[in-house]
Amino acid sequence: YEKGFLQNIEYSIKYDMLHNFNNKLDVISLDGRISTGFKGNSEISITHDYDFVSYYLDKKYSNYASTRIGLNTSPIELLSFGSDISFGKDVAFNDENPELGKEFNFRATLSLQLNNNFSISNLFSFSRLKKVEINEFYYRGFINRLNTKYQFSKSLGIRLATEYNDFSESIFLQPLFEWTPNPFTIFYIGGNQILNKDDKYFVDRSQMFVKFQYLISL
């Protein structure tokens, strides 16, 4: 396939029977995966995970599955994109009385290398787990994170990370200055600012940090 649009096809099947530290059965599952590579440094994959049985907090869950479809591509050096969707059933681990729910997850990443010095990347992820019998959710929300980086030189650069978390209704900001004159010396100075929503207002929590590391070889 090397000269055509279709580059390669790979598949795998995995069977697991896992036990916990007390040597009790924890999970029996069967996973199947197929991936296809295309011209332009692109890949599409499909993964199916079937759990015959699993245990959580001494509770048994039987015969449930989930499917994940993924796409990754980097057709040119300055652009890369990745995305995956998963759906099926999963355990509501965060609930006081964990039951199986209907899950749906979506994730997308986009990275741009605008020039040798400046790059931008964005990550968006959405997750929800819906109760099977009624129209209610164990959880539902999204997180969006934007990272920017500018390199003045190989050793000197600045970064800025911004994130909005819909689950906690919070905003996270992190500016960072970094200096690495050689592989043995690292210097960071930056800060974290978290804005948490409290009723109608955002509560500000700020933190500054400095890190210096020098490796001495003996």
What are these regions (language model features)?
Residues 1-218:
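Exposed, low-structure sequence patches enriched in small/polar residues
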